[in-house]
């Protein structure tokens, strides 16, 4: 089955990003925010998905999480909420279709530039319909995206120790504030890797499949598979195959 209607559904929310709305901001925990726009976009997409695909369950970041369904949509309405609040780029919409724990279809939408990243399992990854592929870059020439998960300050020392070590062994590091953005940078070859010590399934589900279908590899920081969506949090490392093992060694030596 194809899911082309999801593209129009996600694109229909673009105006929330291109025209600033009145924001009501709630702090769920330290530096972990949700806005009325997060909730509105999630509800809009939920209702549209139910109309288009009534047989598929729905799980969103801003609702109670239940990943026990055999078949469900997994949505992050605004990945990069702090950026959105501050009027900074990037923020993205992430939607994954999960079947028996595995992502089988993914779409990430960049509403600021009207760019879609899509993947069906086993069919490759695409940017606005054109095939994308991870880079073949080596460690000393690599750009690595770094996520800091600012609402988990107990991981601060480990995160920045790893980031420093990676910086010393690569060309440079980047910090965007959006896991989806970081993952599509890897998938398109604009960066060689991305790591973060604390992410939820909705943060990375769509990006995981897109990176894999673009020829990359995704694991936790110990090299274990993240292919099964689970409740809770995990570390994540996405890269081209060339530098994955080297990065795992650097991370393990510094966390």
Q: What positions do the PLM features span?
A:
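N-terminal subdomain of lithium-sensitive/metallo-dependent phosphomonoesterases centered on the IMPase/IPPase/PAP
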Residues: 1-78
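Oxyanion/phosphate-interacting regions
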Residues: 1-2, 7-8, 161-167, 184-255
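Residue-level signal for inorganic ion chemistry
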Residues: 16-17, 38, 49, 81, ...
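Conserved beta-strand termini and adjacent loop/short-helix elements that scaffold enzyme active sites
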Residues: 28, 61, 176-178, 221
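Residue-level detector of anion-binding/catalytic polar loops
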Residues: 55-57, 172, 192, 217
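Conserved acidic residues
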Residues: 70-72, 104, 142, 192
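Glycine-rich active-site/cofactor-binding loop and its immediate structural neighborhood
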Residues: 73-113
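Acidic beta-strand-loop-alpha-helix segment within the catalytic core
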Residues: 96-183, 226, 233-255
